[in-house]
């Protein structure tokens, strides 16, 4: 299972330098039977990005993209974990993404993000990360 944060999901709707490599990487992962997920937070954030920056028709494309993902709920235990997970410098919404991904830790093969602070937090808690196309 691949967890995608909003920085990754956005690249699938709004063309950015990493978009092509991300799509290629996801196609390869899908060919190996990998499913993808995000959290309820990722869903809300993506729809807000589309509302702010999207072109006509992107709301429908965003909903189609989200329909193909497992949407992980933000339960009370997830919120409780978000209060303490990762480094103290981790931003609140990033901590929620980490805690949401922790729900699928056993199945998690990669946490896809392009956010440097979130990448650091992922590594601190032991998640394998991927940022296809990013220059590090």
UniProtKB/Swiss-Prot annotation:
It comes from the Bacteria. The keyword Acetylation does not apply. The keyword Hydrolase applies. One of its GO terms (molecular function) is RNA nuclease activity. It is an enzyme of class 3 (hydrolase). InterPro entries: PIN-like_dom_sf, PIN_dom, VapC_family. Mg(2+) binds at residues 5, 94. Keywords: Hydrolase, Magnesium, Metal-binding, Nuclease, Toxin-antitoxin system. Pfam families: PIN. Its cofactor is Mg(2+). Its EC number is 3.1.-.-. Residues 2-104 form the PINc domain. Belongs to the PINc/VapC protein family. Toxic component of a type II toxin-antitoxin (TA) system. An RNase. Its toxic effect on colony formation is neutralized by coexpression with cognate antitoxin VapB47. This is Ribonuclease VapC47. It comes from Mycobacterium tuberculosis (strain CDC 1551 / Oshkosh). The gene is vapC47.
């Amino acid at each position: 299972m691949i967890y995608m944060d909003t920085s990754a999901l956005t690249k699938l709707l709004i063309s950015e330098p990493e978009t092509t490599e991300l799509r290629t990487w996801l196609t390869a992962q899908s060919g190996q039977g990998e499913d993808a997920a995000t959290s309820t937070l990722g869903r809300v954030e993506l729809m807000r990005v589309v509302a702010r920056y999207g072109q006509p028709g992107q709301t429908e494309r965003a909903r189609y993209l989200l329909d193909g993902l497992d949407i992980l709920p933000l339960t009370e235990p997830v919120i409780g974990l978000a209060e303490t997970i990762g480094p103290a410098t981790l931003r609140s919404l990033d901590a929620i993404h980490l805690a949401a991904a922790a729900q699928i830790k056993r199945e998690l093969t990669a946490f896809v993000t392009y956010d440097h602070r979130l990448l650091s937090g992922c590594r601190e808690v032991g998640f394998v990360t991927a940022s296809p196309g990013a220059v590090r």
